Curated annotation (Swiss-Prot):
Membrane spanning residue stretches: none
UniProt-listed GO biological process terms: alcohol biosynthetic process; farnesyl diphosphate biosynthetic process; geranyl diphosphate biosynthetic process; mycotoxin biosynthetic process; sterol biosynthetic process
Protein name in the entry: Farnesyl pyrophosphate synthase ERG20
Keyword Protein transport: no
Native source species: Gibberella zeae (strain ATCC MYA-4620 / CBS 123657 / FGSC 9075 / NRRL 31084 / PH-1) (Wheat head blight fungus)
Gene (UniProt): ERG20
Function: Farnesyl pyrophosphate synthase; part of the second module of ergosterol biosynthesis pathway that includes the middle steps of the pathway. ERG20 catalyzes the sequential condensation of isopentenyl pyrophosphate with dimethylallyl pyrophosphate, and then with the resultant geranylpyrophosphate to the ultimate product farnesyl pyrophosphate. The second module is carried out in the vacuole and involves the formation of farnesyl diphosphate, which is also an important intermediate in the biosynthesis of ubiquinone, dolichol, heme and prenylated proteins.
Family: Belongs to the FPP/GGPP synthase family.
Amino acid sequence: MAKQTTLDEFNAVFPKLEEVLLDHARSYKLPQEQLDWYKKSLEANPLGGKCNRGMSVPDSVSLLLEKPLTEEQYFQAATLGWMTELLQAFFLVSDDIMDSSITRRGQPCWYRQEGVGMIAINDAFMLEMAIYTLLKKYFRTHPAYVDLIELFHETTFQTELGQLCDLLTAPEDNVNLDNFSLEKYSFIVIYKTAYYSFYLPVALALHQLNLATPSNLKQAEDILIPLGEYFQIQDDYLDNFGKPEHIGKIGTDIKDNKCSWLVNQALAVATPEQRKILEENYGRKDDAKELVVKKLYDDLKLEQLYLDYEEKVVGQIRERIANIDESGGLKKTVFEAFLAKIYKRSK
């Protein structure tokens, strides 16, 4: 029987990895003040999140093996998981600067913390490099070492392409709904979110077990990318229709001029008059204008449109899962676990 990891088990691996990273920096005779800074960044940025991406690696390895992991297997899987969390930290530190964000996980964003400022850009680079330090330390002799390096490079670049498309499509200070389209939306969510959040953890698990055949990777990608797209569309839906007490935050997509699924669906069906309402009210930091857009979303019955979309896409994903070829070591349960976590979630 496979066994799910807990956040406590997963977090317990980090101090050992942190020590490896600090030792690596020490090997260059980095002065103590700068070493302390690196330690502070390593503790402020990768830690404190839900670790869904990172924990998906040991969970997937256990499902692939259909049994609980040995101590060594767990350590390897959790180390790969922490690399996804370091990748996420690198993206978030950078993203918060680009978006001029204020808070992250209930704290001021790293670049807004005392004395940090634009040093955060270099800290982000160092978080990215930590991935490759850990890969070399623990996977140098693994048959998939080069594949793992290439997977992280490829996933990083894919995420950066998604981010570029997002930044150029929806600048916060320049509202132009002509920039938006469902094709662009789909590109942004697939590249900015789906690859690193959904495909990467399973690809890492397959590589750890030497099961990353072209067929297994392709089958995983064909399910996990649509799953990641569904997850982001659900996020956009919850931003407007979710209850703040459930999702833990107040939605800001309308005020932030986000290229969200809802605004794209609205643009696709709006009359010229309704489009004019959107153009005059979307992306404005104004409560009254936000309410006008919310009312338009209700008038256009976007909630029902989402619920219909959800049933359709989940049906397609379930069909793909049912048709998985398990002869090469892939397991349907890996994908069922992902779907179960997000289907009909309220936060």
